Design a protein with these regions (language model features):
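Short beta-to-alpha transition helix within the HATPase_c
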Residues: 68-75, 79, 92-109
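PAS-associated C-terminal cap
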Residues: 10-24, 230
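Short beta-strand/loop element within the Bergerat-fold HATPase_c
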Residues: 158-170
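PAS-family sensory domains
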Residues: 2-11
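Glycine-rich ATP-binding loops of the HATPase_c
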Residues: 207-216
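Glycine-rich/acidic phosphate-handling loop/turn and adjacent ATP-lid/helix
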Residues: 171-197
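Conserved short strand/loop->alpha-helix "switch" segment adjacent to the catalytic nucleotide/phosphoryl-transfer site
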Residues: 21, 27-33, 37, 59, ...
Length: 237
């Protein structure tokens, strides 16, 4: 019997062209994203600079304080954007390391040499989309800024702020606790309807989470709970 050889020929030219086009589109997307991130960062710096100049020129102390608060909020948004940019901000974000770097930046920029306040981040891990991570970061930033400003009105020797992030499947809980001045009765505090509270509530609503505040003589804890999250203690009950 004669040996026979069956040859199959496939023209892959079109496939390779499509692959090259896909790679080029991905490259262009990365370049555009990089450019957009730089534009956002530059815009935030410009806005922050304008606010700071306005604050230096006004005569009203109340107006100056409001402008300084606005400047800090713009800079906090810039810090969140910078951390997301540093982490790539394309795929899922590891939340705890992201919050740790963010809070380290906040501590450096907001706590002066005359105040002994430490900021610590603890957690079990957990991943989030870049958009979710951005909102979580902004909430944590707002709550940390609020604690630095209001929880320690005097030069407390051992001021502490602890940011905890727990996960349970798709659900999570973010809490920011301080050991500053709280409420003597230990009841849930009704948060004031200020700009910071409005920002936190709006971001929490976008994430499908609820906000709870508990203040007692030992300090204040604000919790942002997503869906049906249960703490370890409640899961064990």
């Amino acid at each position: 019997a004669e040996d026979s050889i069956l040859l199959g020929i496939e023209d892959v030219t079109e496939r390779r062209i499509l692959e090259r086009e896909k790679d080029e589109l991905l490259r262009q997307k990365d370049v555009m994203l990089e450019e957009l991130q730089h534009r956002v960062a530059n815009s935030l710096q410009i806005i922050a600079g304008i606010i700071l100049m306005k604050a230096a020129r006004v005569e009203s102390e109340e107006t100056r304080a409001h402008l300084q608060d606005a400047h800090k909020r713009v800079m906090s948004i810039a810090a969140v954007q910078a951390q997301l940019h540093a982490s790539g901000a394309v795929g899922p974000i590891d939340v705890v390391p992201y919050l740790s770097k963010l809070c380290s930046t906040l501590a450096t920029s907001m706590i002066n040499d005359n105040r002994t306040i430490t900021i610590k981040v603890v957690g079990e891990g957990g991943m989030a989309t870049p958009r979710e991570a951005e909102s979580i970061g902004l909430i944590a930033t707002e709550l940390v800024m609020n604690a630095i400003k209001h929880a320690f009105p005097t030069d407390q020797a051992d001021g502490r702020i602890v940011i905890a992030y727990e996960v349970d499947g798709p659900n999570w809980k973010l809490s920011v606790a301080d050991n500053g001045c709280g409420r003597p009765d230990g009841t849930f505090a009704q948060t004031k309807t200020g700009l910071g509270t409005g920002i936190v509530k709006a971001l929490a609503q976008q994430l499908g989470a609820k906000v709870e505040t508990l203040a007692d003589p030992e300090g204040t804890t604000v919790s942002i709970t997503h869906a049906t999250f249960l703490t370890r203690e409640n899961r064990a009950a």
